[in-house]
């Protein structure tokens, strides 16, 4: 009969099983990658997540309501105001994704970005987009009411590395035919760089609770383990002494 595993080995086995049970989150991606669009724009939302073999069923939520589509990609052929809002998705082997916001604007221009919150050091790409891709020229990007960059022909504005100074309100303006048009103002926020060491060391509450419970069990189990080992050694020693005493008594006779 084999010996029982010591407490540390048992803890390692249970911990490995717990990690294997963790389910990854699905991820919603926009294609094109812009978080704001104009009415009648074409947008595709793609759900990245794990699927069971042969089953690509995907659940889509829009503002908390379940959509009828169960395809991995959800397409909006001509965006309307009511298409704006929060989108989430889930696959068979992935948990519910974090929300992605889509804004649908009415007007001639919209200032587009992949998102509105950036970390220091990240690149920022801004695009001045016209309704139905009408030709746009003499384009100016403005930050906090001041001209930031001018393009005679429409072009994206690239900021290679974001700093706190890039936080603020932005809009763009230009000419369509001979008409001056402007986008609505948007707010871009640049936050301090994320600390990967700190963020990776923060555990979800259920893992913290698991570690606390396993620590208590380990302490109790370890005490019991060594207590049994001590009693076993004492019992073996007493048995040897008894055998030796009996043997000596027999020789005296």
Swiss-Prot record:
This is Low affinity immunoglobulin gamma Fc region receptor III-B. One of its GO terms (cellular component) is external side of plasma membrane. The chain crosses the membrane at residues 208-226. GO terms for molecular function: IgG binding; IgG receptor activity. Residues 21-207 are extracellular. Receptor for the invariable Fc fragment of immunoglobulin gamma (IgG). Optimally activated upon binding of clustered antigen-IgG complexes displayed on cell surfaces, triggers lysis of antibody-coated cells, a process known as antibody-dependent cellular cytotoxicity (ADCC). Does not bind free monomeric IgG, thus avoiding inappropriate effector cell activation in the absence of antigenic trigger. Mediates IgG effector functions on natural killer (NK) cells. Residues 24-105, 120-189 form the Ig-like C2-type domain. It is a single-pass membrane protein. Glycans are attached at residues 56, 63, 165, 180. Forms a heterooligomeric complex with ITAM-containing signaling subunits FCER1G. Interacts (via transmembrane domain) with signaling subunits; this interaction is a prerequisite for receptor complex expression on the cell surface and intracellular signal transduction. Binds the Fc region of antigen-complexed IgG. Pfam families: Ig_2. Residues 227-253 are cytoplasmic. Keywords: Cell membrane, Disulfide bond, Glycoprotein, IgG-binding protein, Immunity, Immunoglobulin domain, Membrane, Receptor, Repeat, Signal, Transmembrane, Transmembrane helix. PROSITE patterns: IG_LIKE.
């Amino acid at each position: 009969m084999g010996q029982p595993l010591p407490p540390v080995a048992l803890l390692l086995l249970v911990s490995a099983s717990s990690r294997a049970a963790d389910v990854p989150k699905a991820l919603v991606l926009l294609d094109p990658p812009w978080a704001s669009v104009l009415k009648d724009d074409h947008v595709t939302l793609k759900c990245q997540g794990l699927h069971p073999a042969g089953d690509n069923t995907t659940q889509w939520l829009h503002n908390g309501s379940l959509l009828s589509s169960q395809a991995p990609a959800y397409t909006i052929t001509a965006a309307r105001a009511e298409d704006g809002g929060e989108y989430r998705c889930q696959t068979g082997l992935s948990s519910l994704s974090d929300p992605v916001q889509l804004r649908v604007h009415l007007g001639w221009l919209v200032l587009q970005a992949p998102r509105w919150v950036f970390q220091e050091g990240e690149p920022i790409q801004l695009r001045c987009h016209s309704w139905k891709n009408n030709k746009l020229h003499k384009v100016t990007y403005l930050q906090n009411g001041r001209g930031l960059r001018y393009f005679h022909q429409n072009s994206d504005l690239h900021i290679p590395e974001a700093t706190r100074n890039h936080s603020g309100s932005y809009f763009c303006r230009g000419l369509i035919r001979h008409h001056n048009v402007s986008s609505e103002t948007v707010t871009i926020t640049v936050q301090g760089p994320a600390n990967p060491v700190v963020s990776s060391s923060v555990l979800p509450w259920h893992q913290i609770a698991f570690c606390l419970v396993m620590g208590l069990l380990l302490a109790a189990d370890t005490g019991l383990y060594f207590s049994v080992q001590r009693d076993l050694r004492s019992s073996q020693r007493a048995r040897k002494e008894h055998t030796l005493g009996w043997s000596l008594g027999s020789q005296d006779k």
